[in-house]
Structure formats: C-alpha cells, structure tokens
C-alpha cells in the first residue's frame, strides 16, 4: 500500500467530478522520473461543488431567461466564485449549513484515503486550489480544536491530521477572508512538526494571492510564496489564469519535486 496519501481539493467556480485527473496524471508521470512509483502514492479528490452549484445554476438560468444576460461565461465565473465564497460560512442554520456539509465531504474523503495508505501513521499531503485552501485551513483548524478537546479518539492519526507533512496551495484566496481582523490578530493553522506549506500564485490571477504578507504569523508558517505564470497563451495574462494552474509546468514541476521529497522522507 501507499506510503503517502495525497488529498486534492478544488476551489471556487464550476467544477465537475474528475477535476483532479489531468493534474494527477501529469504529476504521476513527473514523479516516475523522480523515482517515485505509482504504488508509493495514493490520491483522493475532495469534490464539493455539488453542494453549492445547483442553487447557483438555478438562479443563473432564471436570471438569464428573464433578463437575457450578456457576458454569460464571465457571469457564470463570477457567480459561482462569489457564490461559493459567500455560501461557505457558518450560518447557525442546522438545516442548511453549507460549511458543515462541505466539511463532512472532506472528512469522508480523508477516511477513504486512509484506507489506501500503508498504516494509520502514513504521511498526508494536501493540495488545495483557490477556495479549497480556505476550506482546508478551516477543516484543519476545526480538527485540531476537536483533538485538543479530547474528541476524535476513534479516528486514526492520519484522519486527525497528525501525520500531515505537506501543504501545496495554488490560486489561494485565504487573504480575502482575514480582513475582519487586525493584522496582528490573524493566525494561521498550526502545522505539525516537520510539515511545510508552499503557495503558488499568478500575478494576473485576481483570485490568487501570496500568503506570507497576511500577518507575521503567516509569514512564519508559510515557507514560500512562488509567483508563476499559469494558463495557456489565451488566458495566462488574464484573470482566467485562476483555472490554469492544474497542468501548468510552472506549478506541476515544483509540485512533483515537493511530493517526491516528502515521499522519500516518509517512513
């Protein structure tokens, strides 16, 4: 069984099941060249768009029918992006809590991934795009809080995130959710000992940002912010570069090395 489990979570915007496959295929090929075999790594996607997208598309169809909207592609991008960001929050409404529904999906995915790795102490890597980075951060925070409170004793160390050794975020918009607090008050998650966090962003991507400037605490926690050029010729210089990271060489090449280093260090 695999030495390392890798969870891949998508971000804001319209997504489909299988979103991770092109990136996983490219990373698998790159890892093979670095001496990491397919059996060394297990992958598990975290697909949550089915929680938020139906309501968004219902509204879009009604609005387009009644208002004959222009710029449909751009409108869908903005609608799903902002809709995801605004919908993913604790509301106190137990009948319609998108936050908890998404976190339940994350937990189920990690439980599934734990079955594919060699032991409860296997190494975990988390790869997160866009809003997925914010979801990941909140899930880790909530999990660590539960562990501290003596809960989750029935979960493995892997599912309690105690074996987390690497985080890769790209097109991350965590900064957008920090402005309700003073800079000095903004604290990141506590990484387990030995874990590293690297972040990638495209300066043309208005939804992806460096993380170290958020606060002194983030500057200390995040190892590096890397500025790259993501997307193809038609999109790399536009805001649409937000969805261009997945198979872009500027991201997948260093990402493969990041994974290989952790795999080689794994017990």
Annotate each language-model stretch with its function.
Residues 30-34, 67-73, 150-152, 191-195, ...:
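Glycine-rich loops and low-complexity Gly/Arg-rich segments
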Residues 41-43, 124, 223:
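Short, conserved active-site loop motifs that form the nucleotide-linked donor/cofactor pocket
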Residues 6-26, 90-194:
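Serine-dependent carboxylesterase/thioesterase catalytic core
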Residues 1-4:
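Proline/glycine-enriched tight loop/beta-turn segments at coil->beta junctions
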Residues 45, 51, 166, 172-267:
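Lipolytic serine-hydrolase domain surface
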Residues 30, 38, 78-82, 126, ...:
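Bulky hydrophobic/aromatic packing residues
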Residues 12-15, 26-32, 37-120:
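Active-site catalytic motif of lipid deacylating hydrolases and related acyltransferases
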Residues 30, 34, 113, 146-150, ...:
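Solvent-exposed amphipathic alpha-helical surface segments
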């Amino acid at each position: 069984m695999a030495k390392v489990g890798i969870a891949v979570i998508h971000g804001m915007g319209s997504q489909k099941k299988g979103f991770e496959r092109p990136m996983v295929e490219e990373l698998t090929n790159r890892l093979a060249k670095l001496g990491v075999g397919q059996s060394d790594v297990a992958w598990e996607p975290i697909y949550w768009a089915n929680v938020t997208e139906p309501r968004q598309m219902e509204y879009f169809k009604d609005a387009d029918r009644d208002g004959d909207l222009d710029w449909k592609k751009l409108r869908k991008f903005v609608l799903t992006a902002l809709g995801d960001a605004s919908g993913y929050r604790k509301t106190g409404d137990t009948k319609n809590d998108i936050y908890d529904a998404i976190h339940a999906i994350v937990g189920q995915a990690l439980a599934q991934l734990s079955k594919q790795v060699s032991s409860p102490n296997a190494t975990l890597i988390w790869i997160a795009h866009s809003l997925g980075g914010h979801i990941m951060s909140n899930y880790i925070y909530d999990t660590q809080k539960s562990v501290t409170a003596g809960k989750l004793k029935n979960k493995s160390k892997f599912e309690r995130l105690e074996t987390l050794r690497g985080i890769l975020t790209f097109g991350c918009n965590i900064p957008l959710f920090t402005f309700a607090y003073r800079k000095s008050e903004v604290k990141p998650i506590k990484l387990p000992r030995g874990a590293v966090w690297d972040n990638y962003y495209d300066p043309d991507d208005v939804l992806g940002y460096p993380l170290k400037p958020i606060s002194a605490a983030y500057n200390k926690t995040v190892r590096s912010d890397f500025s790259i050029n993501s997307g193809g010729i038609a999109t790399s210089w536009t805001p649409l570069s937000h969805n261009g990271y997945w198979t872009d060489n500027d991201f997948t090449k260093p990402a493969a090395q990041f994974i290989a280093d952790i795999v080689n260090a794994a017990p």
